[in-house]
Amino acid sequence: MSEIIEVIYEDGVLKPLKPLKIKGKKRLKIKIVNDDVEEFLKSMIIKKCKDIDYKKLKEAYYESF
């Protein structure tokens, strides 16, 4: 299962902004994406098109790393 979540880095710990559906002591891999990337995606001119699934576009972008 893959999921994109938002976190805040505070006191040396990444803290999710919403509850996670993960069992305790589960080992995961985390991809760190800076907010600058989010701002870039939001500012893209393509975003003005109505027929684009932006959730899928965003997920495809993150999966490319």
Curated annotation (Swiss-Prot):
UniProt xrefs under InterPro entries: AF2212-like, AF2212-like_dom_sf
Family statement: Belongs to the UPF0165 family.
Protein name: Putative antitoxin MJECL31
Role played: Possibly the antitoxin component of a type II toxin-antitoxin (TA) system.
UniProt KW Protein biosynthesis keyword: no
Organism placement in taxonomy: Archaea, Methanobacteriati, Methanobacteriota, Methanomada group, Methanococci
Keywords of the record: Plasmid, Toxin-antitoxin system
Highest taxon, organism lineage: Archaea
Record's keyword annotation contains Signal: no
UniProt xrefs under Pfam families: AF2212-like
